Structure formats: C-alpha cells, structure tokens
C-alpha cells in the first residue's frame, strides 16, 4: 500500500512539473476614475460634485435617474424640440501612464436620425466655459435609433494613450425632437 501511495505521489508530482509555464496573466491596470451614478436623487437635475451640466441649445439639462436600483445620468428632452447639453466629468488625472476609457450608454424613443450622443476629451477645460476648451471627439460606440430601447451597450475600450495629466471627459447629447433620451452609466478610466 505504501508503495502504491509513493508511486501515485511521484506520478502526480511529475505531472505538475511537466506543465507548461508559458501561461501569463495580463498586466494589472489600476482604476483611476469611476462614476457609477449610484449615489443620487431620482429625477433631479444632475449636480454631482465636480461635474459640469451645461445646456448649449434649449434649456434641457442632464438628470439623475434611478430605475430598478440602478442609477444613471439621463438626457431627456421633454420641452425643447432642438436641445443639446454637455455632461462633463471632474478633472481626471491620467498621470503618465497609457489609460483607457469605458462607459455604457442607452437610448429610448429615438424617432429619427439627427439625435446624437458624442464623447469628447479636453486638457484645457476651465470648469465653466465649454467654448474656450479644445474638445477632441473620441471614437466610442454609442446607441443609434436602431439600438433596442433602454438596453445599455458598451462603448468599447477607448484608448487615451495620447493624453497625460488632467483631462475632462464630456458627453454631449443632441436631440431634434421631444420625448427621446440618452442614458450614461459606469464611466471608468483605467
């Protein structure tokens, strides 16, 4: 019996030492910014500390919304046929490391082309005047009129490697009719 146990132990040991060691884990990247909109007050104008919420056309602003225990930012044009507003993050310090932006977005009741959700980045936003900053549009996947209503989709990984130091990320929603909306959730920079 001892001999069988010894043999079994040695075979097991040989099996483990014969494994390929080429498996490696991807490098760890720390999260430098997260906004999941979970600590908010439902159906109020979005006023999270550090964010800018600016109506460019019309009077519609981004709102704080809560549905089924999930918080998110919503741009819903209820009164203005043509409206546009910017939701701008607080400054995010990217440091000197290559970073990635990711977020989720959804739409509802988009009746026609012309309504858009765009994402921008700036290194020179002063916190109040959107026209004085140099905004660069980022290529992100955002919902279209063909995206299922209320279904959050991934933006994809947006490479921010061309940027260092402090930046602001802006979400600009434009509507050409009332009753349609965009949602933003889970903004992450890592």
Regions found by a protein language model. Give the residues of each.
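Bacterial N-terminal signal peptides that target proteins for export
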Residues: 1-8
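Bacterial Sec-dependent N-terminal signal peptides
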Residues: 3, 13-41
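Extracellular glycan-recognition surfaces and repeat-rich motifs
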Residues: 33-77
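Extracellular beta-strand-rich recognition modules
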Residues: 37, 89, 96-109, 117, ...
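Extracellular beta-rich ligand/substrate-recognition surface
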Residues: 73-85, 144-151
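Short beta-strands within extracellular/lumenal beta-sheet-rich domains
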Residues: 79-100, 153-157, 183-184
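Extracellular ligand-binding interfaces
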Residues: 104-141
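Terminal, low-complexity interaction segments
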Residues: 141-190
